[in-house]
């Protein structure tokens, strides 16, 4: 994959891609995300990293057009984690869950051509183990005792 692209955001709200030396749109940034191209967006005034803010703008545009990914209830539940004792744990949980989902999506696509039933069984077992580990982490973070699990061989 290519090196990290730097995009500058100027006070006039325009985005400038320093790699291709031209102004780009949020749709272009979305294309970078979809292609897996690493990038950072920097505020031109002070070089602060505003990548998350730009990604949230893209998500907002996606959510307002077409079929939304998040329900209002789901968004409200996520907001309730801000400032709480489990905010960091919840963030790691979401990131781990998304990473797992993406990896499994790739594995399923690749493996279904070989042995569909064996693949689904193996992924299901792996999924159960990962969810159990994440549940244990949440319980520990909340201060509940967690009994050690026996790992299947």
UniProtKB/Swiss-Prot annotation:
BP-aspect Gene Ontology terms: regulation of DNA-templated transcription
Pfam families linked to this entry: PHB_acc (PF05233), PHB_acc_N (PF07879)
Name this polypeptide is given: Uncharacterized protein Alvin_0064
